[in-house]
Each structure stands twice: as structure tokens, then as C-alpha cells.
């Protein structure tokens, strides 16, 4: 026990561990807030689609030699979120088809660019890190943490400011339109916030596992709670808890950060499913 405590104290003496915890917890909180809305609107896979777009944008940033890929990844992901929303409203192309079309195309272009114009000799390692976030969160700099904090504050503030409108759009968009409210504007806000979350989460779990941060906490909360507010609060608590446990386990056990967080989310989801069975039986 003494060796474990000494090892733990040693790890937390390194700044990169604190950076990883701060960024991880903020990203988990942001992704859980909007995850409930995306799941209820049956648009949860927009996270998967935008993450593939972000992967392609990172490849473009590497191609032009930018040291900070945020200048390319963020605007491209936001524009793609808007395009996904507009294309999904097209009668000829439904939402699922639009997501598949844009995400698969971006993923293919990104992987091709990384192979044709490699930024380093270890192409496989670069792709693995981008897709699964295996090491990037443990190599964060102080400037990365500051950017993450600023973007997280923007996301949380936007969610709180437009909370009631987001709630209305989630449950009865047609009524909002009939009442004269421009629901498309709030759908656009949801898409932009989602794009910001995707860009933030790239360093944590990689582009292939981002949807897990959005979906699992929301689904876990829905096992036990029914009201929108309760589900959002529970989802945020679950997401932050899983991120903290996942990062801590990853550092201590040497496992990949992203996959460890997702596995923790999956385990918590099954625990909530079991608890929901007991609560149903007790209520009967």
C-alpha cells in the first residue's frame, strides 16, 4: 500500500498528469451535456461523422506543416457540422446518409494524405494516435490546456444560455416552428457546439471513440432517470467520473487513455442497466 501511495504521489508530481486530468474532465463534462440531446434527437452519430472530418482536417494541417492544427481542424469541423445539418434536411438525402457520405469521404481523404505526404517516418503511430488518442493527451502543453479551458467555458455557457430552447427543440421541434420560433437556428447552435466538443475530444479518445463519450453517459443516465434535467445532470456526473477513473487507470496500468475511458463507460452502463432492473422491480 505504501508503494502504491508513493507511486501515486510521484505521478501527480508531473505537470502532464494534471494537464491530462483537467482536459479529460472538461471534455467529458462538455460531451455529456449535449449527448442527451443528440441521443434523444436520434442524431448521436453526428459525433462519429464529425470526428472523421476532424481526422481528415488534421491530415490537411500536417500537409501544410502547421504545428498547431487547431487553426484548420476547428473551422473545417464547424463548417462540416453546418453542412451535415443542411444536407440532412434535404429531402433527397436523409440525415444518416449525409453523415455516412461526409464522414467516410473525410476519413478516406485524410488517410490517403497521411500516406502520400507523411509528416513523420512513423505513419502507423501517427494514424493510431489520431484514431484512438493513445498518447496525445499525455503530451499536452500548458497552452493546450488553456485553449481547452476557454473552449469548454464557451460550450458550457452556450448550453446554459440556450438550455430551454435546446430542450424544446429536442422534444417538439414542430411545435416550436408552429409557434414562430426559428428552430433551425437552435439546431445550428447544437451542431456548432457538437463540432467544438469533437475538436476538444480528439486529444482524449481519438476520432474513432468520440461517439462513446457522447452516447454512453446519456444512455446510462436514461436507465435510472426520466426527466430531461435529471438525465443531463446524471450524464455529466457519470461522464466526469468515467473520465477520471479511465485516466487514472491508464496512467497507473499503462493502458491507452481513450480506450480505457470508453471501457469504463461501458462498465458503468451495464451497472446502471442492472440497477434499473432492481428499481423497476421495487416500483412494481
Where are the language model's segments positioned?
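Membrane-interfacial amphipathic/re-entrant helices at transmembrane-helix boundaries
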Residues: 1-29, 283-284
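Transmembrane helix-bundle core of multi-pass membrane transporters
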Residues: 7-10, 103-160
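Structural signature of hydrophobic alpha-helical transmembrane segments
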Residues: 16-28, 67-78, 149, 199-212, ...
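Hydrophobic alpha-helical transmembrane segments
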Residues: 21-25, 70-75, 97-101, 145-150, ...
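Short loop segments and helix-boundary regions at transmembrane helix junctions
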Residues: 36-51, 55-121, 221-233, 250-254, ...
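Helix-loop-helix "hairpin" substructures at the membrane interface of multi-pass membrane proteins
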Residues: 140-217
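Transmembrane alpha-helical segments in multi-pass inner-membrane proteins
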Residues: 203-259
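Cytosolic-side transmembrane-helix boundaries in multi-pass membrane proteins
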Residues: 255-262, 266-284
Amino acid at each position: 500500500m505504501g508503494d502504491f501511495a508513493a507511486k501515486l504521489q510521484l505521478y501527480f508530481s508531473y505537470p502532464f498528469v494534471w494537464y491530462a486530468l483537467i482536459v479529460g474532465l472538461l471534455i467529458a463534462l462538455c460531451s455529456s451535456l449535449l449527448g442527451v440531446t443528440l441521443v434523444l434527437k436520434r442524431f448521436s452519430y453526428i459525433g462519429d461523422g464529425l470526428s472523421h472530418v476532424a481526422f481528415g482536417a488534421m491530415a490537411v494541417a500536417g500537409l501544410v506543416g502547421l504545428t498547431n492544427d487547431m487553426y484548420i481542424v476547428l473551422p473545417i469541423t464547424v463548417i462540416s457540422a453546418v453542412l451535415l445539418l443542411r444536407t440532412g434536411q434535404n429531402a433527397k438525402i436523409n440525415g444518416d446518409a449525409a453523415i455516412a457520405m461526409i464522414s467516410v469521404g473525410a476519413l478516406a481523404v485524410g488517410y490517403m494524405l497521411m500516406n502520400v505526404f507523411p509528416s513523420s517516418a512513423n505513419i502507423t503511430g501517427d494514424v493510431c494516435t489520431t484514431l484512438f488518442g493513445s498518447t496525445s493527451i499525455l503530451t499536452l502543453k500548458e497552452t493546450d490546456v488553456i485553449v481547452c479551458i476557454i473552449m469548454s467555458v464557451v460550450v458550457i455557457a452556450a448550453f446554459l444560455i440556450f438550455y430551454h430552447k435546446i430542450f424544446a427543440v429536442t422534444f417538439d421541434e414542430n411545435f416550436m416552428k408552429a409557434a414562430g420560433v426559428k428552430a433551425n437556428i437552435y439546431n445550428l447552435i447544437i451542431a456548432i457546439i457538437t463540432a467544438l466538443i469533437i475538436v476538444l475530444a480528439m486529444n482524449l479518445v481519438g476520432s474513432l471513440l468520440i461517439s462513446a463519450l457522447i452516447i454512453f453517459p446519456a444512455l446510462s443516465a436514461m436507465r435510472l432517470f426520466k426527466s430531461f434535467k435529471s438525465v443531463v445532470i446524471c450524464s455529466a456526473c457519470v461522464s466526469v467520473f468515467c473520465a477520471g477513473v479511465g485516466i487514472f487507470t491508464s496512467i497507473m496500468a499503462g493502458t491507452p487513455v481513450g480506450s480505457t475511458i470508453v471501457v469504463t463507460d461501458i462498465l458503468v452502463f451495464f451497472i446502471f442497466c442492472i440497477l434499473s432492473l432492481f428499481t423497476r422491480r421495487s416500483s412494481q
